[in-house]
Amino acid sequence: LVRSRQKDNHLTYQSCCYWSLSPRALVLFDIDGVIRDVGGSYRRALSETVYHYSGYLPTAAEIDALKGEGLWNNDWEASLELLRRRGTSSLLPTFDDIVAVFSEAYFGGDPHGDPANWKGFIGNETLLVPPEFFNTLNDAGFAWGFVSGAEPPSCRYVLEQRLGLVDPPLIAMGDAPDKPNPQGLLRLTALLLGRHQAPGLGPLAPPVAYLGDTVTDVFTLQRARQAVPDQRWRALAVAPPHLHAVEAQSARGDYEEQLLRAGAEAILATTAAVIEAMEAWLGEIDQE
């Protein structure tokens, strides 16, 4: 990881390959609920969008239940689905109207404009990893990237401006079909393997893990495995931040069981625990 200082003395981090051999493994990340806490931003915008049209404010548990179905990774579509389930089908807004209301709540300004002018819920997001986390991944010999269903301006904001990453490997909304379609995951994996001069997807390629926080993320990895069955894949999962509170312990247990039933092969306590999980997995592979 190359570190450089901008004029404002802010450290930036740029992914690069400094290994003489291919990386030991690839670690791909979802962003929402894994790299940043969106409980007060994307999820709040979803709730506020539903409230705007129905007068009803969905709870975090209701959103979790919807996400647990593995079908509603796109929050605009999730907003519409919650409105349908409230019995407002005959009065449903258009998809474009949903997007406009949601975007105003989340960004509070032009998504493609200067982030300094955004006044929306995006300003509430806290980071779940420090910038140095990516340096640690590189030191461990892991190549990394991001496969997210969030809008590109939102992804770039958290990765580049908040975390200081330079040109991070990213598949965002619009770059590939929505998850759980595995095309984005497969595309980024192939890109990273080529960039690091590693063998292509298959039995000779480095192992690949994907860390997400929803059933949809787990399904995405499982479908990638179906597409390329001779590649070593690992579905890793972490419960979203709002379930880490002491009072949410029971709900968190239920949520993690749901992730396991969907096919997650390991549940992590935190995103940072991915390094230990990867080392354990590579150790298992060495014993094969």
Residue ranges and their predicted role:
Residues 18-64:
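Active-site neighborhood of HAD-like aspartate-dependent phosphohydrolases
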Residues 54-67, 87-106, 165-168, 196-206:
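Short, surface-exposed acidic
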Residues 107-146, 150-158, 182:
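Short, acidic loop-to-helix structural element flanking the phosphoryl-transfer center
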Residues 210-266:
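Acidic, Mg2+-coordinating phosphoryl-transfer loop and its flanking beta/alpha structural elements
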Residues 265-273:
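Short acidic-hydrophobic, aromatic-tinged amphipathic segments that line or gate anion-handling sites
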